[in-house]
Amino acid sequence: VSEATAVEVAATGINWNFSPCIAIPQDEKWGRHYEGYSEHVDIVSEMGEASIIGYQTTELGSVNHSIVACAKHFIADGATIWGTGMGNQSDKIDRGNAPISDSLIRAKYLPPYQRALDAGVGTVMASFNSINDLKCHANGYLFNDLLKGEMGFDGFVISDWQGIDEIPGDYKSDIVKSVNAGLDMIMVPGAVKGGGEHYKTFLQLFKESVDEGLILEERLDDAVRRILRVKFRSGLIDNPMTDRTLLEKAGSDEHKAIAREAVQKSLVLLKNDGILPLSNSKHYYVTGSGADDIGKQCGGWTIKWQGELGNITPGTSIIDGIEQYSTTNRNNENKKFDAAIVVVGEDPYTEMKGDSDQLYLSAKDKESIDEVKKMNIPYVVVLITGRPLIVNEIIDNSNAFLVAWLPGTEGGGVADILFGE
């Protein structure tokens, strides 16, 4: 998957991907829960390493290309506590505080980063959260002592999106604290404290800080050296232009097949009382908010920051995939059905917008299930979600229950499992 992703990204002219996220989510209420591979350190370590190798040493078919990977978010973003979220989200969890010991950091949250470094990851992104009430973006122990010193990381550290602005103090002190803490590249989009054009304000205050000795030139030289090192290693200096032949692979049938296989292998069947696999010769009533919605399948970070409902990008919806096998209520004029498939689940979200302590299906989704129950035919529930939800009663009442997670643009992979392919 990461090899194909590298080719797709490189084809656009972008040579750096802010991935993999090797967070270890501990609270399903967190709006970034789905960005982590697992709550188990060994799985996260293994998946993160594989992604980095795929991104940075890509060799897929006749294409030999790579992009720079970024392990994120350093560190313990999945360990924050509900009720410690940032600013006006203080009643939530995203960008909150992780009250954890150094020994727990080393035992649970550091191993995926060690595997990332062993795999040669080029960059690491700082985390929005705090550890014991100290913002990671200002925590020199994490980056100077632990990551660069003890672990020997010689790539560069980048801030998160406007991440230094959340450090207590004025904007100049944010710059000084973050750069001295070991951040080598700062993302400064949007407005900054005190207003003004963000990049001009940053450059002015950064230069002042160096001139005043608040940031030593040695620290600046180190940051520049690290950034150039990654550029040389990635081949960007010797070959800065995009290989346009990669466009032939972008959106190719080969890549779509890889995505579809990934969907097939990531689903979880929680219940089957014999209704699955479905039969090609029967007719199915397909309903629910997620039956024909690629945006819902993709979730957040798709086209827009928070994602968007609807068929917002080319792909195969779940009902499209089902109709590759059998007829549905979209083309069955007789209105006689042997069973029903109800596709329900979460609408797209990301970050603090997805923080929620109400991990239940919406009233609309429950109505769709109740509608099918009244038809007195067997039914399968397919759940689209970025995290576990409380659906015990729905599982009990259904004939089969399949968790599709966020299958992306290849909804046909869900249909493959329903029909036993």
Predicted regions and their residues:
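Glycoside hydrolase catalytic-domain context in secreted enzymes
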Residues: 1-421
